[in-house]
From Swiss-Prot:
Belongs to the UPF0337 (CsbD) family. Pfam families: CsbD. InterPro entries: CsbD, UPF0337_stress_rsp, YjbJ_sf. This is UPF0337 protein Bd3330. It comes from Bdellovibrio bacteriovorus (strain ATCC 15356 / DSM 50701 / NCIMB 9529 / HD100).
Amino acid sequence: MNKDIFQGKIKEISGELRKKWGALTDDDIQKTKGNMEALSGLVQQKIGLSKEEASKQLSEFMTDIDKKFTSTGESASDKVNSKIDAIKNKLSH
């Protein structure tokens, strides 16, 4: 997930972050404004991990989230396209 997409989806991702690291609050997460370095520092501080371990875990988390959002996005996109096709079909008859 690239940086801009991550920053745009921070609200959606916030719940997943709290599931993984319960010590994080929505407020903490929102203050990072989707900045990966700030988020890594937050995980490091709140969870008590080394800088390297926090970065590693956050990177793994983002890979998992990216897969989740990608697969969800594709199925939602497929549904939307299907509805659009159905509407076009109705209008053409």
